[in-house]
Every structure is written in structure tokens, then in C-alpha cells.
From Swiss-Prot:
Positions of the catalytic residues: 231 (proton acceptor)
Gene Ontology MF, one: dioxygenase activity
Pathway assignment: Antibiotic biosynthesis; tetracenomycin C biosynthesis
Protein family membership: Belongs to the PheA/TfdB FAD monooxygenase family.
Originating organism: Streptomyces glaucescens
Protein's name according to its UniProt entry: Tetracenomycin A2 monooxygenase-dioxygenase
Biological process, per Gene Ontology: antibiotic biosynthetic process
Keywords linked to the UniProt accession: Antibiotic biosynthesis, Dioxygenase, FAD, Flavoprotein, Monooxygenase, Oxidoreductase
SUPFAM superfamilies according to UniProt: FAD/NAD(P)-binding domain (SSF51905)
Keyword presence, Oxidoreductase: yes
Binding site for FAD: 15, 35, 128, 152, 322
């Protein structure tokens, strides 16, 4: 049996795995993905795409494609102000006694989606069944090999790589793949995680649920009271748990398709007992619309849980997405977190594989993403509990949605001059501090608008003030000496980037000759308040530390808090 060699093997072809293949390909890294299912999902989950995830998709040229596949998410008040446009969805969560009584519905959550000052893009609504093919096609176009109906039967890992047994499920043929690294994006139950013996912490299983995708014309019923989620009383049906604190949930999927969810006790009722007709009747009862024509398109059982892996790395193997963290769907954080895991890991693997970074850079994947994954899981748990049982204690623990999605921060060896007590701050602080994503400022280039967020992608970026032209020579020298792509962009002055609104220095807090060092994933790695005497030496020292090449000590300003 021949052995195929590949730099990175990805197990799991959901949103996280496909994103990993795409982002690795963006950085020029060959990879192979194997997925046991026959194709991308037909299940309708993970519809809400955060502005941060949209930024990542924008970075690989997919923003317009996603926008064309789904409606824009807007604030409820804004939607009403605009006359309730059909091509927009208000992000509103309500609780009602039935769809026949929406005029008395109570608004549970109506978060602000005003991210124009934070991001060059915004949240959109695009279900997993539509997003996965988009990611797959772009990853393949960029050179990734993606094999569905193919599973990893077993693997062994050693100090130099991973050896995996791969099975083509259509033919039964076995083959061997030798990879430098393995990304386990193989879901909640993650055989890879279990094989490695990585344990998890959290609340564990919350309950067994049934999700029913159905088609029904509810346009007139919900007219003027549109929502993304509506909590309804559980119908008095055999097998449906009658717990007042756990209601049924109705969620919009698209114009005339909806997802209805309820909990059941598997000790008393098996999933097979929920036939299409029975599910349709449960939906009619819960909505209070006994004559509603319902076409059940799919019903699937699933387990709601709250768990975070205690480690994201074991030698040459990395956990990502649901394999690393899983939580209730409240907040729409799950898929976004998995895509962001993949984005964080991809540039680091690329740097190590290309020989421009030391292996210790890969340790920063866990240093950065594990605290975020655990904190986001906790925020989803808090939201889930708060929506069902409001309390002042839960309100105090709750973080605003855009803060969880965009405002988080990293503390790691790849962030210099800053350390933070927790990954999600109490308020937005996108001001150019190390560990945060670069603040969004609209700049001008060649007569067009470009965001500071758009300037990275496949290289480090030095973003300097208008009198920081000398950073260009420093960046060029360091790039040549280290063999690392470093682009320099003085903003204003004689540079190609203009600051038409005069917002750059005020937003970043830089002096006119200071600079930010931005990582390929868009996060600030280091900042210099002023141009140092030896700009090239300071920049080189910073990059060597970030890339785990030496223990040099760069200048810059230390930040805490």
C-alpha cells in the first residue's frame, strides 16, 4: 500500500474543516481533507455569520458571494424604520404564547448590530447548507484536495508527523497518508480527541433535542413581527418534555422554511417515534395554528451540550471547531468560532511549514483560542439560561453580542507588550492595543476606500503614521533578512494610503511616526509609540519573538489590563 505525503491532513468537512482547507490554501499550503459524509451538509444550522467571520470571508474574496446567498441582518428598530424590507431580517428574539398571539409577544433580546464603526462589513444570514459549498468550491479552486465519502480509519502520531489510514467508503479501498500535521475538525464526538485522551470541562449534556425543518407559509402570520427566534410553550404531546423553563423554539431559516426545536427524553421516546406527521402536529399545536399546512422536510435528533477541551494541541495534532468547544446555539457563536479557529491556525502552520517560524509559534494557537473558546461557550450558556430565566446575576455576566464576536483579545507569546486577565473585555477597545484585532478605519487608496482590516491576509503589515516613512526601509530590510513577507503602509503624508476622515491617529492612539505590527490574521502583535533609533532592529527583534525564532527583546509600550 503506497503512502501519500501531504503537509496538512484535515479530518472533517464541515464549516471548520472546509475553512481550514481554504485558509491554508490562501497561504499556499497544500492540504487534503477527508469527510465521511457523501457531500456538504443538507442540514440547516449555523445561519448567523458574524461581522468578524464576514471579514475573514472578505479576505478570501467571498463576501459578495455570501451576501448574494442570504439576507442582511439588521437591528429590529432599524428594520421597522426602513418599512420592514423583505431582503432584511431583524435580529429579534421573542417569547409568545403562539404565532396567533404575536401582538402580545415579549421581546427577549434585540442586540445592536451597528458595527459600522467596528468593521468594514456586517453580519449576514447564510445557512450552513449554503455556506459549506461556497467554502468547498473556493478551497478546491485554490488547490486543496477535498474527498467526501472518505473516512480516517485510524492514525498514529510521532515527533515528526502523523500517519493515517484512509478508507474510500465507495470502494472500500484503503490508503496511507503521512502528514506533517493533522487538524481534527471532526465534530462534537471527535474520535481524534477521544483517541488522544484529551478531556473536557463544562456543564456537559444539557438535553436531547429534536430539530424539524419544515415548510409553511407564515408570511401573513408574522407580518410586522418578524423574528429570528421565537420561544413557544411546549405542546402537550407525548414524548415532549413539559419543562416550563425549557420551551419549544421556532427559528427562521429562509422566506418560507423554519426550524422547530423541542426537547425529549430518550429514555421514554426514541427519535424514530417522531414521524413527519407527528412533528407536523406538534408544530401546529405549539404555534397555535391548528389548520396550518406543514411540510416536514427533515427531522433530526441532536444533543445540546456545553464542553470545552482542556487542550487544543497534542504534538502534531490540533483540535478545532466543535471538536474543541461546543455550547448551546444561543448567540450564533458556534460556527463562527470554528471558522476563526481555522483562520488563527492556518497562518501559523504556514509559517512553520515554510521554515519562517519555530514550532513554538504553534503553541500560541492553544494559548489564544482555548481561552476564547471557553469564554464564548460560557457566554452561549449564559444566553441560553438568561433567555429562559432572566435574572440580574445573568445580566451582569452577559457580554454584548458584537463584543463576543469582534472585541475579544489574545494573550500569548505571539503578542508582545500586553497581557489581559480575561479574553472578552467589558467594553470594546479596538484601539490598536496588542492582542486585539486591528481597529477598522476607512482609508483611501487610488481613489477607492480600503479598510485597515483589509490590509493583511498573507503577510505581516507595518501600519505607520504619516511621518513614519522610515518604517518602509525597516520593513524591507527585515523582510529580506528573515525571509518573511512584511508590507509597510504609512497612512497619510507621502504614502499611498490617505486618511480622508483624519481618523487614523485618533483611533489607533499612535503618534505621527509610531507604528503597529499587524499579524497575517489581522491582530496587532506589537506597537511602537514612536520611531526608534534602530527601527529595523526593533522590528526584527519583535518579529523573531512573535515567530518563535529567538528570545530577542523588542521595544514598544507594555500594556496591561
Amino acid at each position: 500500500m503506497s503512502t501519500e505525503e501531504v503537509p496538512v491532513l484535515i479530518v472533517g468537512g464541515g464549516l471548520t474543516g472546509l475553512s481550514a482547507a481554504l485558509f491554508l490554501s490562501q497561504h499556499g499550503v497544500s492540504c487534503r481533507l477527508v469527510e465521511k459524509h457523501r457531500g456538504t451538509t443538507v442540514l440547516t444550522r449555523a445561519s448567523g455569520i458574524s461581522s468578524r467571520t464576514m471579514e475573514l470571508l472578505r479576505g478570501v474574496g467571498l463576501e459578495r458571494t455570501v451576501i448574494e446567498r442570504g439576507p442582511k441582518l439588521v437591528e429590529g428598530a432599524r428594520w421597522r424604520e426602513l418599512g420592514q424590507p423583505a431582503d432584511q431580517i431583524p435580529w429579534v428574539v421573542i417569547r409568545a404564547n403562539g404565532l396567533h398571539d404575536l401582538e402580545n409577544a415579549v421581546t427577549v433580546e434585540e442586540p445592536s448590530l451597528d458595527v459600522g464603526h467596528l468593521s468594514p462589513t456586517r453580519p449576514y444570514w447564510c445557512g450552513q447548507d449554503r455556506l459549506e459549498p461556497i467554502l468547498r468550491d473556493e478551497a478546491v479552486r485554490r488547490g486543496a484536495r477535498i474527498d467526501f465519502n472518505t473516512r480516517m480509519e485510524a492514525f498514529t502520531a510521532d515527533e515528526s508527523g502523523v500517519t493515517a489510514t484512509i478508507v474510500d467508503q465507495a470502494t472500500g479501498e484503503q490508503s496511507t497518508v503521512r502528514a506533517r500535521y493533522l487538524i481534527a475538525a471532526d465534530g462534537v464526538r471527535s474520535p481524534v480527541r477521544e483517541t488522544l485522551g484529551i478531556t473536557r470541562t463544562g456543564h456537559g449534556t444539557i438535553g436531547n433535542a429534536m430539530s424539524v425543518l419544515f415548510k409553511a407559509d407564515l408570511r401573513d402570520t408574522v407580518k410586522g413581527r418578524r423574528f429570528v427566534i421565537c420561544y413557544l410553550p411546549n405542546p402537550d404531546e407525548p414524548g415532549v418534555l413539559q419543562l416550563p423553563e425549557v420551551p419549544a423554539v421556532l427559528q427562521l431559516f429562509d422566506e418560507d422554511r423554519w426550524i422547530f426545536g423541542f426537547f425529549f427524553d430518550p429514555r421514554e421516546t426514541s427519535p424514530e417515534q417522531f414521524t413527519d406527521e407527528r412533528c407536523a402536529q406538534i408544530i401546529r399545536t405549539a404555534t397555535g395554528l391548528p389548520g396550518l399546512p406543514v411540510e416536514v422536510q427533515m427531522a433530526r435528533p441532536w444533543e445540546m451540550s456545553h464542553n470545552s477541551a482542556r487542550s487544543y494541541r497534542s504534538g502534531r495534532v490540533f483540535l478545532a471547531g466543535d471538536a474543541a468547544h461546543v455550547h448551546p446555539p444561543a448567540g450564533a457563536f458556534g460556527a463562527n468560532g470554528g471558522i476563526q479557529d481555522a483562520h488563527n491556525l492556518a497562518w501559523k502552520l504556514a509559517a512553520v511549514l515554510k521554515g519562517t517560524a519555530g514550532d513554538a509559534l504553534l503553541d500560541t494557537y492553544e494559548q489564544e483560542r482555548l481561552p476564547i473558546g471557553a469564554a464564548v461557550a460560557d457566554q452561549a450558556w449564559i444566553r441560553h439560561t438568561w433567555r429562559l430565566n432572566d435574572s440580574e446575576e445573568l445580566r451582569r455576566a452577559l457580554r454584548e453580542s458584537t463584543l463576543v464576536a469582534t472585541g475579544y483579545r489574545y494573550t500569548s507569546d505571539a503578542v508582545l507588550g500586553a497581557a489581559y486577565p480575561e479574553p472578552i473585555p467589558a467594553a470594546h477597545d479596538l484601539t490598536g492595543r496588542p492582542g486585539y484585532r486591528v481597529p477598522h478605519v476607512w482609508l483611501g487608496r487610488g481613489g477607492e476606500r480600503v479598510s485597515t482590516v483589509d490590509l493583511g491576509g498573507d503577510a505581516f503589515v507595518v501600519l505607520a503614521g504619516p511621518d513614519g516613512g522610515e518604517w518602509q526601509a525597516a520593513a524591507d530590510k527585515v523582510a529580506q533578512d528573515l525571509g518573511v513577507p512584511v508590507h509597510c503602509h504609512p497612512v497619510g503624508g507621502d504614502g499611498q494610503l490617505t486618511d480622508p476622515d483624519g481618523a487614523f491617529l485618533g483611533t489607533t492612539g499612535l503618534t505621527r511616526n509610531g507604528a503597529l505590527l499587524i499579524r497575517p490574521d489581522g491582530f496587532v502583535a506589537w506597537r511602537a509609540e514612536y520611531l526608534p533609533e534602530d527601527a529595523a532592529g526593533e522590528l526584527r527583534s519583535a518579529l523573531e519573538r512573535i515567530l518563535a525564532r529567538t528570545s530577542g527583546t523588542p521595544g514598544g509600550t507594555a500594556l496591561e489590563g
